Amino acid sequence: MRGCNKKKKAKYIVIVFFAIIILGRFFIPWAIEPENFRDTKNKINSFINRYTIPDSYNAKSLIAVDLSNNNDFVSKRANEQQTPASLAKLFVIDYATTLVDLDDVVLAKNEAISLTKQGSSVANIKEKKYYVKNLFAAMLVPSGNDAAYVLADYCGGIISPKATTSKERIEVFMKNLNEYLKQNDYKDTILYDPSGFDTEAHTTVLDLEEVVMDLLKNEWFKDIVSQTSYTATLPDGSMQTWKNTNTFLDPTSEYYNKNVIGVKTGSLSDDFNLVVLYKKHGKEFLICSL
């Protein structure tokens, strides 16, 4: 009888041993993923390191890049398509640079301005002349949807001089923009509205990473996106000032971070998107979040 009990006990020990191995094999890799047990991990870290527990960050997709070596050191669902919202303007500007120069003069038409959706962000563009660089700044700093329509209208006129209305010119621009995206390997991005005020559009953080890295090669871009507010000098000599929607740049904001030097925010409905350029210890890091 005693020998039988020993065999049963040994059998249970073996079963428990293998159960632990199997559990460890599948559970531990899952548990160490950043999004799993986030609250518990934060509490443990806060106890060990004695810091305040941060709010959980629940981005659907995320990528972080060390620009010194282009290494993606954080990645979460980087290939998953999401709504870009106002970050669509980054692709619009990138394509527009292939058609126009910064000092080109654009007459903002009321026909194009009036296409701006009610309740969306604006740069208070008037029916007057602007430099292309002014319009870029108006799209990047206050995230002006009106500026996006004016730019798309102007560029569409270059592509198709026979187009007779702003709507036609913008449609031509968007069609050619999407062709440009395909040709330049932004394979997971498609846009239908130059302002980004569109729930049908989609992109990925990988495509965002590529377009922003391309734009960051331009000093004018880095200068614009790094400023808390931007004052533009228009062709007629007048000036217009815009406040940046990126509160990380605002010293008066509770979210201010001295290490943030750009780039852009984007929101639509319940989607809050962000592209951050972060500088520390002489290195720059790009964070794209959707």
Residue ranges and their predicted role:
Residues 1-13:
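N-terminal Lys/Arg-rich, disordered targeting/topogenic segments
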Residues 29-206, 215-216:
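Active-site-adjacent loops and short helices of periplasmic peptidoglycan-processing enzymes
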Residues 5-8, 22, 86:
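Short alpha-helical segments used as structural interaction elements across diverse proteins
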Residues 6, 28-29:
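Conserved SxxK-family serine transpeptidase/carboxypeptidase catalytic domain
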Residues 13-27:
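Hydrophobic membrane-insertion alpha-helices, especially the h-region
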Residues 186-190, 199-207, 212-290:
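Domain-terminus/edge residues, biased toward the C-terminal soluble/receptor-binding domains
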